[in-house]
Protein backbone atom coordinates (compact mmCIF):
# COMPACT_ATOMS: atom_id res chain seq x y z
CA UNK A 1 0.00 0.00 0.00
CA UNK A 2 2.86 2.37 0.87
CA UNK A 3 4.50 1.75 -2.50
CA UNK A 4 1.24 2.44 -4.34
CA UNK A 5 0.80 5.69 -2.41
CA UNK A 6 4.31 6.84 -3.28
CA UNK A 7 3.78 5.92 -6.91
CA UNK A 8 0.53 7.91 -6.90
CA UNK A 9 2.29 10.96 -5.47
CA UNK A 10 5.02 10.49 -8.04
CA UNK A 11 2.45 10.37 -10.83
CA UNK A 12 0.95 13.65 -9.63
CA UNK A 13 4.39 15.21 -9.72
CA UNK A 14 5.07 13.68 -13.13
CA UNK A 15 1.84 15.18 -14.42
CA UNK A 16 3.12 18.61 -13.42
CA UNK A 17 6.15 18.03 -15.64
CA UNK A 18 4.34 16.73 -18.72
CA UNK A 19 3.50 20.14 -20.15
CA UNK A 20 7.10 21.27 -20.26
CA UNK A 21 8.81 18.61 -22.30
CA UNK A 22 11.64 20.59 -23.79
CA UNK A 23 14.07 23.39 -23.19
CA UNK A 24 12.00 25.78 -25.26
CA UNK A 25 8.71 24.79 -23.65
CA UNK A 26 9.86 26.48 -20.45
CA UNK A 27 9.69 29.79 -22.30
CA UNK A 28 5.90 29.51 -22.35
CA UNK A 29 5.64 28.72 -18.64
CA UNK A 30 3.65 30.96 -16.30
CA UNK A 31 5.86 31.57 -13.23
CA UNK A 32 2.79 31.89 -10.98
CA UNK A 33 1.92 28.24 -11.57
CA UNK A 34 5.42 26.89 -11.56
CA UNK A 35 6.17 23.85 -9.38
CA UNK A 36 9.17 24.94 -7.32
CA UNK A 37 11.44 22.95 -4.98
CA UNK A 38 10.23 25.03 -2.04
CA UNK A 39 6.60 24.13 -2.75
CA UNK A 40 7.09 20.41 -3.18
CA UNK A 41 9.85 19.01 -0.95
CA UNK A 42 8.57 18.68 2.60
CA UNK A 43 8.77 15.01 3.67
CA UNK A 44 10.75 11.84 2.93
CA UNK A 45 7.73 10.59 0.99
CA UNK A 46 8.20 13.57 -1.32
CA UNK A 47 11.76 12.38 -2.01
CA UNK A 48 10.56 8.97 -3.16
CA UNK A 49 7.73 10.52 -5.15
CA UNK A 50 10.14 12.85 -6.90
CA UNK A 51 12.37 9.95 -7.93
CA UNK A 52 9.30 8.04 -9.19
CA UNK A 53 8.38 11.10 -11.26
CA UNK A 54 11.93 11.24 -12.59
CA UNK A 55 11.70 7.62 -13.76
CA UNK A 56 8.38 8.38 -15.43
CA UNK A 57 10.27 10.89 -17.56
CA UNK A 58 13.12 8.43 -18.17
CA UNK A 59 10.72 5.75 -19.41
CA UNK A 60 9.38 8.09 -22.06
CA UNK A 61 12.82 8.63 -23.60
CA UNK A 62 12.63 5.03 -24.85
CA UNK A 63 9.00 3.90 -24.79
CA UNK A 64 8.81 4.23 -28.57
CA UNK A 65 11.37 4.57 -31.33
CA UNK A 66 11.16 8.28 -32.17
CA UNK A 67 13.61 9.58 -29.53
CA UNK A 68 16.14 6.96 -30.61
CA UNK A 69 16.03 7.69 -34.37
CA UNK A 70 19.41 9.53 -34.31
CA UNK A 71 21.01 6.14 -33.64
CA UNK A 72 20.05 5.10 -37.19
CA UNK A 73 23.19 6.95 -38.34
CA UNK A 74 25.25 3.97 -37.19
CA UNK A 75 26.36 1.40 -39.74
CA UNK A 76 24.32 -1.34 -38.06
CA UNK A 77 20.83 0.10 -38.65
CA UNK A 78 19.03 1.45 -41.69
CA UNK A 79 15.41 2.18 -42.53
CA UNK A 80 12.58 1.74 -44.98
CA UNK A 81 12.92 4.62 -47.47
CA UNK A 82 9.15 4.70 -47.93
CA UNK A 83 6.10 3.79 -45.87
CA UNK A 84 5.83 6.19 -42.91
CA UNK A 85 9.54 5.89 -42.05
CA UNK A 86 10.81 9.10 -43.64
CA UNK A 87 11.92 10.50 -40.27
CA UNK A 88 14.30 7.66 -39.47
CA UNK A 89 15.33 7.36 -43.13
CA UNK A 90 16.38 11.03 -43.13
CA UNK A 91 18.54 10.49 -40.06
CA UNK A 92 19.95 7.31 -41.55
CA UNK A 93 20.95 9.44 -44.57
CA UNK A 94 22.58 12.17 -42.41
CA UNK A 95 20.04 14.62 -43.85
CA UNK A 96 17.57 15.49 -41.10
CA UNK A 97 15.71 18.74 -40.62
CA UNK A 98 14.68 20.42 -37.37
CA UNK A 99 11.04 19.38 -37.76
CA UNK A 100 11.96 15.67 -37.86
CA UNK A 101 9.95 13.89 -35.16
CA UNK A 102 13.01 11.90 -34.14
CA UNK A 103 14.99 15.10 -33.60
CA UNK A 104 12.15 16.79 -31.73
CA UNK A 105 11.41 13.84 -29.45
CA UNK A 106 15.08 13.17 -28.68
CA UNK A 107 15.47 16.80 -27.59
CA UNK A 108 12.16 17.25 -25.79
CA UNK A 109 12.12 14.03 -23.81
CA UNK A 110 15.70 14.22 -22.59
CA UNK A 111 15.24 17.84 -21.52
CA UNK A 112 12.10 16.68 -19.71
CA UNK A 113 14.30 14.31 -17.67
CA UNK A 114 16.67 17.20 -16.99
CA UNK A 115 13.82 19.33 -15.65
CA UNK A 116 12.68 16.56 -13.30
CA UNK A 117 16.27 16.04 -12.15
CA UNK A 118 16.81 19.77 -11.59
CA UNK A 119 13.74 19.91 -9.37
CA UNK A 120 15.27 17.23 -7.14
CA UNK A 121 18.79 18.67 -7.15
CA UNK A 122 17.47 22.08 -6.15
CA UNK A 123 14.88 20.91 -3.65
CA UNK A 124 15.71 17.62 -1.94
CA UNK A 125 17.95 19.37 0.57
CA UNK A 126 14.89 21.16 1.99
CA UNK A 127 13.43 17.93 3.36
CA UNK A 128 13.69 17.38 7.09
CA UNK A 129 14.69 13.73 6.83
CA UNK A 130 17.57 11.29 6.81
CA UNK A 131 20.67 12.17 4.82
CA UNK A 132 20.67 8.65 3.39
CA UNK A 133 17.25 9.17 1.77
CA UNK A 134 18.27 12.59 0.50
CA UNK A 135 21.46 11.16 -0.97
CA UNK A 136 19.47 8.55 -2.87
CA UNK A 137 17.29 11.28 -4.39
CA UNK A 138 20.30 13.46 -5.18
CA UNK A 139 22.19 10.51 -6.66
CA UNK A 140 19.37 9.48 -8.97
CA UNK A 141 18.87 13.08 -10.08
CA UNK A 142 22.57 13.72 -10.70
CA UNK A 143 22.90 10.45 -12.59
CA UNK A 144 19.95 10.84 -14.94
CA UNK A 145 20.72 14.49 -15.59
CA UNK A 146 24.23 13.43 -16.60
CA UNK A 147 22.83 10.57 -18.68
CA UNK A 148 20.45 12.92 -20.52
CA UNK A 149 23.16 15.46 -21.27
CA UNK A 150 25.41 12.60 -22.41
CA UNK A 151 22.74 11.56 -24.90
CA UNK A 152 22.07 15.10 -26.08
CA UNK A 153 25.69 16.20 -26.50
CA UNK A 154 26.46 13.20 -28.71
CA UNK A 155 23.37 13.79 -30.84
CA UNK A 156 23.25 17.62 -31.04
CA UNK A 157 26.76 18.77 -30.15
CA UNK A 158 26.56 22.20 -28.50
CA UNK A 159 23.49 22.40 -26.27
CA UNK A 160 22.13 24.72 -23.54
CA UNK A 161 23.03 23.67 -20.00
CA UNK A 162 19.99 24.01 -17.74
CA UNK A 163 20.71 23.31 -14.08
CA UNK A 164 17.79 24.80 -12.17
CA UNK A 165 14.09 25.57 -12.43
CA UNK A 166 14.52 29.29 -13.09
CA UNK A 167 12.81 30.08 -16.37
CA UNK A 168 15.17 33.01 -16.92
CA UNK A 169 17.89 30.44 -17.68
CA UNK A 170 16.04 28.97 -20.60
CA UNK A 171 17.11 31.33 -23.37
CA UNK A 172 20.71 30.33 -22.70
CA UNK A 173 23.35 30.06 -25.38
CA UNK A 174 24.35 26.53 -26.36
CA UNK A 175 27.41 25.57 -24.34
CA UNK A 176 30.58 24.25 -25.92
CA UNK A 177 30.83 20.47 -26.07
CA UNK A 178 33.74 20.45 -23.61
CA UNK A 179 31.67 22.43 -21.10
CA UNK A 180 28.78 19.98 -21.36
CA UNK A 181 31.14 17.08 -20.69
CA UNK A 182 32.58 18.87 -17.66
CA UNK A 183 29.10 19.05 -16.18
CA UNK A 184 28.39 15.41 -17.03
CA UNK A 185 31.56 14.30 -15.23
CA UNK A 186 30.74 16.42 -12.18
CA UNK A 187 27.21 15.03 -11.96
CA UNK A 188 28.45 11.46 -12.29
CA UNK A 189 31.10 11.94 -9.62
CA UNK A 190 28.42 13.34 -7.32
CA UNK A 191 26.17 10.37 -8.12
CA UNK A 192 28.96 7.89 -7.36
CA UNK A 193 29.37 9.45 -3.92
CA UNK A 194 25.63 9.56 -3.24
CA UNK A 195 24.26 6.27 -4.59
CA UNK A 196 24.18 2.89 -2.82
CA UNK A 197 25.46 -0.31 -4.41
CA UNK A 198 22.13 -2.02 -3.70
CA UNK A 199 18.59 -1.15 -2.64
CA UNK A 200 16.52 -3.15 -0.18
CA UNK A 201 13.10 -1.57 -0.62
CA UNK A 202 10.42 -1.04 -3.26
CA UNK A 203 10.11 0.55 -5.74
CA UNK A 204 13.89 1.00 -5.89
CA UNK A 205 14.32 -2.78 -6.12
CA UNK A 206 11.86 -5.09 -7.86
CA UNK A 207 12.07 -8.61 -9.32
CA UNK A 208 15.41 -9.11 -7.55
CA UNK A 209 17.11 -6.32 -9.51
CA UNK A 210 17.83 -2.69 -8.71
CA UNK A 211 15.35 -0.57 -10.63
CA UNK A 212 16.93 2.68 -9.49
CA UNK A 213 20.46 3.45 -10.55
CA UNK A 214 23.39 2.28 -8.39
CA UNK A 215 26.93 3.44 -7.71
CA UNK A 216 28.39 0.79 -10.00
CA UNK A 217 26.12 1.86 -12.85
CA UNK A 218 27.27 5.45 -12.38
CA UNK A 219 30.91 4.31 -12.43
CA UNK A 220 30.33 2.33 -15.61
CA UNK A 221 28.70 5.36 -17.19
CA UNK A 222 31.63 7.54 -16.18
CA UNK A 223 33.95 5.04 -17.88
CA UNK A 224 31.93 5.42 -21.09
CA UNK A 225 31.96 9.21 -20.74
CA UNK A 226 35.74 9.28 -20.31
CA UNK A 227 36.07 7.11 -23.42
CA UNK A 228 33.91 9.57 -25.36
CA UNK A 229 36.06 12.45 -24.15
CA UNK A 230 39.21 10.57 -25.15
CA UNK A 231 37.91 10.30 -28.71
CA UNK A 232 36.19 12.62 -31.17
CA UNK A 233 35.46 15.52 -30.91
CA UNK A 234 37.45 16.43 -27.76
CA UNK A 235 40.31 14.03 -28.54
CA UNK A 236 41.72 14.04 -25.01
CA UNK A 237 43.44 10.75 -25.73
CA UNK A 238 45.50 8.44 -23.52
CA UNK A 239 44.92 10.20 -20.20
CA UNK A 240 41.16 9.84 -20.49
CA UNK A 241 41.30 6.24 -21.64
CA UNK A 242 43.29 5.59 -18.47
CA UNK A 243 40.54 7.26 -16.41
CA UNK A 244 37.95 5.12 -18.20
CA UNK A 245 39.93 1.96 -17.48
CA UNK A 246 40.11 2.85 -13.78
CA UNK A 247 36.34 3.27 -13.47
CA UNK A 248 35.51 0.09 -15.39
CA UNK A 249 38.12 -1.92 -13.50
CA UNK A 250 36.72 -0.85 -10.16
CA UNK A 251 33.32 -2.26 -11.17
CA UNK A 252 34.93 -5.49 -12.37
CA UNK A 253 37.08 -5.88 -9.25
CA UNK A 254 34.06 -5.45 -6.97
CA UNK A 255 31.76 -7.73 -8.94
CA UNK A 256 31.90 -10.41 -6.26
CA UNK A 257 29.72 -8.01 -4.30
CA UNK A 258 27.52 -6.94 -7.20
CA UNK A 259 26.93 -10.35 -8.80
CA UNK A 260 26.78 -9.42 -12.48
CA UNK A 261 27.17 -12.27 -14.96
CA UNK A 262 27.48 -13.00 -18.63
CA UNK A 263 24.40 -15.04 -19.53
CA UNK A 264 25.81 -18.44 -20.58
CA UNK A 265 23.49 -18.62 -23.61
CA UNK A 266 23.36 -15.54 -25.83
CA UNK A 267 19.72 -16.25 -26.65
CA UNK A 268 18.91 -15.25 -23.05
CA UNK A 269 20.39 -11.75 -23.32
CA UNK A 270 17.24 -10.23 -24.86
CA UNK A 271 14.82 -12.99 -23.84
CA UNK A 272 11.51 -11.97 -22.25
CA UNK A 273 11.91 -15.16 -20.23
CA UNK A 274 15.04 -13.60 -18.73
CA UNK A 275 13.75 -10.05 -18.53
CA UNK A 276 15.29 -9.22 -15.14
CA UNK A 277 18.68 -10.80 -15.60
CA UNK A 278 22.00 -10.30 -13.85
CA UNK A 279 23.85 -9.21 -16.97
CA UNK A 280 21.98 -5.91 -17.17
CA UNK A 281 23.99 -3.41 -15.16
CA UNK A 282 21.69 -0.50 -15.96
CA UNK A 283 18.16 -0.98 -17.23
CA UNK A 284 14.92 0.90 -17.67
CA UNK A 285 11.98 -1.05 -16.28
CA UNK A 286 8.65 -0.98 -18.08
CA UNK A 287 5.17 -2.34 -17.63
CA UNK A 288 2.34 -2.84 -20.09
CA UNK A 289 -0.46 -0.90 -18.42
CA UNK A 290 -1.05 1.46 -21.30
CA UNK A 291 0.32 3.58 -24.09
CA UNK A 292 2.67 6.53 -23.88
CA UNK A 293 3.82 6.44 -20.29
CA UNK A 294 5.89 3.54 -18.97
CA UNK A 295 5.47 0.60 -21.31
CA UNK A 296 7.82 -0.68 -24.00
CA UNK A 297 6.35 -0.29 -27.47
CA UNK A 298 9.13 -1.98 -29.39
CA UNK A 299 7.92 -5.57 -29.80
CA UNK A 300 6.70 -4.96 -33.38
CA UNK A 301 9.52 -2.63 -34.44
CA UNK A 302 11.86 -5.24 -35.90
CA UNK A 303 9.43 -7.41 -37.87
CA UNK A 304 9.10 -6.25 -41.48
CA UNK A 305 5.81 -4.76 -42.63
CA UNK A 306 5.38 -7.28 -45.46
CA UNK A 307 5.27 -10.44 -43.33
CA UNK A 308 1.59 -10.49 -42.37
CA UNK A 309 1.69 -10.06 -38.59
CA UNK A 310 1.56 -6.28 -38.22
CA UNK A 311 5.27 -5.56 -38.00
CA UNK A 312 6.26 -1.90 -38.06
CA UNK A 313 9.64 -2.35 -39.73
CA UNK A 314 11.17 0.65 -37.97
CA UNK A 315 14.72 -0.69 -38.14
CA UNK A 316 16.33 -2.80 -40.85
CA UNK A 317 19.75 -4.35 -40.58
CA UNK A 318 22.44 -2.74 -42.73
CA UNK A 319 23.67 -5.27 -45.26
CA UNK A 320 27.46 -4.87 -45.10
CA UNK A 321 27.46 -4.88 -41.28
CA UNK A 322 25.38 -8.07 -41.25
CA UNK A 323 27.72 -9.66 -43.80
CA UNK A 324 30.79 -8.90 -41.63
CA UNK A 325 29.08 -10.02 -38.44
CA UNK A 326 30.79 -13.12 -36.91
CA UNK A 327 28.72 -16.28 -37.15
CA UNK A 328 27.54 -17.92 -33.95
CA UNK A 329 24.93 -17.77 -31.17
CA UNK A 330 25.08 -13.97 -30.88
CA UNK A 331 24.32 -13.36 -34.55
CA UNK A 332 21.50 -15.91 -34.39
CA UNK A 333 20.00 -14.04 -31.42
CA UNK A 334 20.27 -10.57 -32.95
CA UNK A 335 19.18 -11.37 -36.52
CA UNK A 336 16.49 -13.70 -37.84
CA UNK A 337 18.24 -16.69 -39.38
CA UNK A 338 15.14 -17.28 -41.49
CA UNK A 339 12.30 -14.88 -42.32
CA UNK A 340 8.83 -16.22 -41.55
CA UNK A 341 5.48 -15.21 -43.00
CA UNK A 342 2.49 -15.30 -40.69
CA UNK A 343 -1.30 -15.42 -41.00
CA UNK A 344 -2.95 -14.90 -37.63
CA UNK A 345 -0.84 -17.08 -35.36
CA UNK A 346 0.16 -19.53 -38.09
CA UNK A 347 3.53 -19.53 -39.86
CA UNK A 348 2.73 -20.06 -43.54
CA UNK A 349 6.24 -20.05 -45.05
CA UNK A 350 9.87 -19.21 -44.37
CA UNK A 351 12.89 -18.25 -46.45
CA UNK A 352 16.26 -16.53 -46.44
CA UNK A 353 15.90 -12.76 -46.66
CA UNK A 354 17.67 -12.76 -50.04
CA UNK A 355 15.75 -15.65 -51.65
CA UNK A 356 14.27 -15.24 -55.14
CA UNK A 357 11.95 -18.17 -56.02
CA UNK A 358 12.15 -20.11 -59.26
CA UNK A 359 8.40 -20.81 -59.18
CA UNK A 360 5.25 -19.39 -57.62
CA UNK A 361 4.42 -20.41 -54.07
CA UNK A 362 0.79 -20.63 -52.98
CA UNK A 363 -0.17 -21.03 -49.31
CA UNK A 364 -3.48 -21.75 -47.55
CA UNK A 365 -5.50 -18.80 -46.29
CA UNK A 366 -6.42 -19.00 -42.62
CA UNK A 367 -10.21 -18.94 -42.48
CA UNK A 368 -12.28 -17.18 -39.83
CA UNK A 369 -13.93 -19.31 -37.16
CA UNK A 370 -16.90 -17.04 -36.44
CA UNK A 371 -19.76 -17.91 -38.80
CA UNK A 372 -20.63 -14.33 -39.77
CA UNK A 373 -16.98 -13.35 -40.24
CA UNK A 374 -16.36 -16.52 -42.26
CA UNK A 375 -19.31 -15.76 -44.55
CA UNK A 376 -17.98 -12.23 -45.11
CA UNK A 377 -14.45 -13.54 -45.75
CA UNK A 378 -15.62 -16.12 -48.30
CA UNK A 379 -17.66 -13.49 -50.12
CA UNK A 380 -14.64 -11.20 -50.34
CA UNK A 381 -12.36 -13.98 -51.58
CA UNK A 382 -14.86 -15.13 -54.21
CA UNK A 383 -15.23 -11.55 -55.45
CA UNK A 384 -11.46 -11.22 -55.75
CA UNK A 385 -11.20 -14.51 -57.65
CA UNK A 386 -13.92 -13.34 -60.05
CA UNK A 387 -12.21 -9.96 -60.51
CA UNK A 388 -8.88 -11.61 -61.35
CA UNK A 389 -10.46 -14.26 -63.62
CA UNK A 390 -9.17 -12.77 -66.86
CA UNK A 391 -5.96 -11.34 -65.43
CA UNK A 392 -2.58 -12.96 -66.05
CA UNK A 393 -1.57 -12.14 -62.48
CA UNK A 394 -3.70 -13.90 -59.89
CA UNK A 395 -3.24 -13.46 -56.15
CA UNK A 396 -6.06 -15.67 -54.79
CA UNK A 397 -7.36 -19.06 -55.94
CA UNK A 398 -9.56 -21.93 -54.83
CA UNK A 399 -8.17 -25.47 -55.09
CA UNK A 400 -10.21 -28.52 -54.05
CA UNK A 401 -12.51 -26.27 -52.05
CA UNK A 402 -9.62 -24.57 -50.20
CA UNK A 403 -8.65 -20.93 -50.60
CA UNK A 404 -5.00 -20.07 -51.25
CA UNK A 405 -3.03 -16.86 -51.75
CA UNK A 406 0.09 -16.19 -53.80
CA UNK A 407 2.90 -15.62 -51.33
CA UNK A 408 6.03 -15.77 -53.50
CA UNK A 409 6.01 -14.84 -57.18
CA UNK A 410 8.49 -16.49 -59.52
CA UNK A 411 11.57 -14.34 -60.12
CA UNK A 412 10.65 -11.70 -57.53
CA UNK A 413 12.11 -11.15 -54.07
CA UNK A 414 10.41 -13.24 -51.40
CA UNK A 415 11.06 -10.54 -48.79
CA UNK A 416 10.19 -7.12 -50.21
CA UNK A 417 12.46 -5.34 -47.74
CA UNK A 418 15.46 -7.39 -48.97
CA UNK A 419 17.51 -6.69 -45.85
CA UNK A 420 18.58 -8.57 -42.72
CA UNK A 421 15.95 -8.44 -39.98
CA UNK A 422 16.71 -7.78 -36.32
CA UNK A 423 14.96 -9.83 -33.63
CA UNK A 424 16.12 -8.02 -30.48
CA UNK A 425 12.69 -6.79 -29.42
CA UNK A 426 10.56 -9.46 -31.12
CA UNK A 427 8.59 -11.94 -28.99
CA UNK A 428 6.86 -15.24 -29.75
CA UNK A 429 3.19 -15.91 -29.10
CA UNK A 430 1.02 -18.89 -28.20
CA UNK A 431 -1.80 -20.25 -30.35
CA UNK A 432 -4.16 -17.58 -29.00
CA UNK A 433 -1.73 -14.73 -29.69
CA UNK A 434 -0.60 -14.25 -26.09
CA UNK A 435 2.99 -13.23 -25.44
CA UNK A 436 5.39 -16.01 -24.45
CA UNK A 437 8.15 -15.35 -21.93
CA UNK A 438 10.92 -17.41 -23.47
CA UNK A 439 13.96 -16.96 -25.71
CA UNK A 440 12.83 -15.80 -29.13
CA UNK A 441 12.67 -18.44 -31.86
CA UNK A 442 12.50 -16.97 -35.37
CA UNK A 443 10.70 -20.08 -36.68
CA UNK A 444 7.73 -19.78 -34.30
CA UNK A 445 4.69 -17.44 -34.44
CA UNK A 446 5.26 -13.82 -33.48
CA UNK A 447 3.46 -11.76 -30.86
CA UNK A 448 1.70 -8.79 -32.44
CA UNK A 449 0.50 -7.05 -29.28
CA UNK A 450 3.00 -4.20 -29.77
CA UNK A 451 3.19 -3.31 -26.05
CA UNK A 452 4.94 -5.23 -23.28
CA UNK A 453 7.01 -4.87 -20.11
CA UNK A 454 10.46 -5.41 -21.60
CA UNK A 455 13.32 -4.12 -19.48
CA UNK A 456 15.56 -2.06 -21.74
CA UNK A 457 19.26 -2.88 -21.50
CA UNK A 458 21.23 0.36 -21.33
CA UNK A 459 24.50 -1.11 -20.02
CA UNK A 460 25.40 -4.79 -19.86
CA UNK A 461 28.30 -6.34 -17.98
CA UNK A 462 29.84 -7.52 -21.25
CA UNK A 463 30.16 -3.87 -22.26
CA UNK A 464 32.02 -2.94 -19.09
CA UNK A 465 34.50 -5.75 -19.75
CA UNK A 466 35.07 -4.47 -23.28
CA UNK A 467 35.31 -0.84 -22.16
CA UNK A 468 38.03 -1.79 -19.73
CA UNK A 469 39.86 -3.91 -22.29
CA UNK A 470 39.80 -1.24 -25.00
CA UNK A 471 40.69 1.60 -22.63
CA UNK A 472 43.54 -0.37 -21.07
CA UNK A 473 44.98 -1.06 -24.51
CA UNK A 474 44.70 2.57 -25.60
CA UNK A 475 46.16 3.81 -22.28
CA UNK A 476 49.24 1.60 -22.45
CA UNK A 477 48.24 -0.56 -19.48
CA UNK A 478 48.88 -4.29 -19.05
CA UNK A 479 47.21 -6.28 -21.84
CA UNK A 480 46.87 -9.68 -20.20
CA UNK A 481 43.59 -9.00 -18.37
CA UNK A 482 42.27 -7.02 -21.33
CA UNK A 483 42.84 -10.00 -23.64
CA UNK A 484 41.20 -12.31 -21.12
CA UNK A 485 38.05 -10.15 -20.99
CA UNK A 486 37.81 -9.99 -24.78
CA UNK A 487 37.99 -13.79 -24.95
CA UNK A 488 35.40 -14.05 -22.18
CA UNK A 489 32.91 -11.97 -24.15
CA UNK A 490 33.54 -13.93 -27.36
CA UNK A 491 33.32 -17.40 -25.79
CA UNK A 492 29.52 -17.45 -25.75
CA UNK A 493 29.09 -15.20 -28.80
CA UNK A 494 30.89 -16.82 -31.73
CA UNK A 495 31.57 -20.33 -32.99
CA UNK A 496 34.12 -22.10 -30.79
CA UNK A 497 36.76 -22.25 -33.53
CA UNK A 498 36.68 -18.45 -33.85
CA UNK A 499 36.88 -17.35 -30.20
CA UNK A 500 40.58 -16.44 -30.29
CA UNK A 501 40.60 -15.13 -33.87
CA UNK A 502 39.38 -11.61 -34.61
CA UNK A 503 38.92 -10.01 -38.01
CA UNK A 504 40.14 -6.41 -37.90
CA UNK A 505 38.94 -3.57 -40.11
CA UNK A 506 41.67 -4.15 -42.72
CA UNK A 507 40.47 -7.74 -43.15
CA UNK A 508 43.41 -9.31 -41.33
CA UNK A 509 42.67 -12.12 -38.87
CA UNK A 510 44.72 -11.88 -35.68
CA UNK A 511 44.91 -14.26 -32.73
CA UNK A 512 44.07 -12.41 -29.51
CA UNK A 513 47.17 -13.69 -27.70
CA UNK A 514 49.36 -12.26 -30.47
CA UNK A 515 47.75 -8.81 -30.56
CA UNK A 516 49.68 -5.64 -29.85
CA UNK A 517 47.97 -2.79 -28.01
CA UNK A 518 46.61 -1.08 -31.13
CA UNK A 519 45.19 -4.34 -32.51
CA UNK A 520 43.60 -5.21 -29.18
CA UNK A 521 42.02 -1.77 -28.85
CA UNK A 522 40.54 -2.07 -32.33
CA UNK A 523 39.35 -5.61 -31.66
CA UNK A 524 37.51 -4.49 -28.52
CA UNK A 525 35.97 -1.52 -30.32
CA UNK A 526 34.72 -3.83 -33.08
CA UNK A 527 33.49 -6.39 -30.54
CA UNK A 528 31.43 -3.80 -28.71
CA UNK A 529 29.73 -3.00 -32.00
CA UNK A 530 28.76 -6.64 -32.38
CA UNK A 531 27.47 -6.73 -28.77
CA UNK A 532 25.09 -3.77 -29.14
CA UNK A 533 24.18 -4.15 -32.83
CA UNK A 534 20.61 -3.08 -33.47
CA UNK A 535 19.95 -2.28 -29.81
CA UNK A 536 19.16 1.39 -30.24
CA UNK A 537 18.28 1.75 -26.54
CA UNK A 538 21.86 1.03 -25.43
CA UNK A 539 23.58 3.94 -23.72
CA UNK A 540 26.54 3.43 -26.07
CA UNK A 541 25.18 2.36 -29.43
CA UNK A 542 27.12 1.51 -32.56
CA UNK A 543 26.52 5.09 -33.73
CA UNK A 544 28.01 6.41 -30.47
CA UNK A 545 31.08 4.23 -30.94
CA UNK A 546 31.54 5.45 -34.50
CA UNK A 547 31.23 9.06 -33.31
CA UNK A 548 33.98 8.52 -30.74
CA UNK A 549 36.27 6.95 -33.32
CA UNK A 550 35.35 9.63 -35.91
CA UNK A 551 34.11 6.97 -38.32
CA UNK A 552 30.68 8.39 -39.17
CA UNK A 553 32.28 10.02 -42.23
CA UNK A 554 33.49 6.58 -43.31
CA UNK A 555 29.96 5.22 -42.93
CA UNK A 556 28.54 8.17 -44.89
CA UNK A 557 30.99 7.71 -47.77
CA UNK A 558 30.27 3.99 -47.96
CA UNK A 559 26.54 4.72 -48.14
CA UNK A 560 27.03 7.32 -50.89
CA UNK A 561 28.92 4.77 -52.99
CA UNK A 562 26.41 2.04 -52.12
CA UNK A 563 28.26 -0.70 -53.97
CA UNK A 564 26.43 -4.04 -54.24
CA UNK A 565 27.34 -6.54 -51.52
CA UNK A 566 27.60 -10.24 -52.34
CA UNK A 567 25.46 -11.80 -49.63
CA UNK A 568 25.21 -15.44 -50.66
CA UNK A 569 26.24 -17.93 -53.33
CA UNK A 570 24.40 -21.01 -54.53
CA UNK A 571 26.44 -22.91 -57.10
CA UNK A 572 27.15 -20.48 -59.93
CA UNK A 573 24.52 -18.00 -58.74
CA UNK A 574 25.46 -14.93 -56.70
CA UNK A 575 22.97 -12.94 -54.65
CA UNK A 576 23.78 -9.25 -54.21
CA UNK A 577 22.02 -6.46 -52.35
CA UNK A 578 22.31 -2.70 -51.87
CA UNK A 579 21.03 -0.28 -49.27
CA UNK A 580 17.57 1.16 -49.95
CA UNK A 581 17.96 4.60 -48.33
CA UNK A 582 19.72 6.99 -50.71
CA UNK A 583 22.61 8.98 -49.23
CA UNK A 584 23.84 11.88 -51.36
CA UNK A 585 25.94 15.03 -51.32
CA UNK A 586 29.37 15.95 -49.97
CA UNK A 587 30.45 15.21 -46.41
CA UNK A 588 30.67 18.02 -43.86
CA UNK A 589 31.21 17.88 -40.11
CA UNK A 590 27.79 19.35 -39.38
CA UNK A 591 26.20 16.17 -40.77
CA UNK A 592 27.34 14.40 -37.60
CA UNK A 593 24.92 16.29 -35.38
CA UNK A 594 21.18 16.77 -35.59
CA UNK A 595 19.80 20.28 -36.11
CA UNK A 596 18.04 21.91 -33.18
CA UNK A 597 14.26 21.35 -33.22
CA UNK A 598 12.48 23.98 -35.27
CA UNK A 599 10.00 24.80 -32.50
CA UNK A 600 12.77 25.46 -29.98
CA UNK A 601 14.59 27.66 -32.45
CA UNK A 602 11.46 29.76 -32.76
CA UNK A 603 11.31 30.26 -28.97
CA UNK A 604 15.01 30.67 -28.27
CA UNK A 605 16.85 32.77 -30.88
CA UNK A 606 20.14 31.30 -29.65
CA UNK A 607 19.09 27.98 -31.17
CA UNK A 608 18.72 29.38 -34.67
CA UNK A 609 21.06 27.84 -37.23
Mark where each language-model region is.
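Short coil/turn linking the two alpha-helices of tandem helical-hairpin repeats
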Residues: 153-155, 160, 199, 228-235, ...
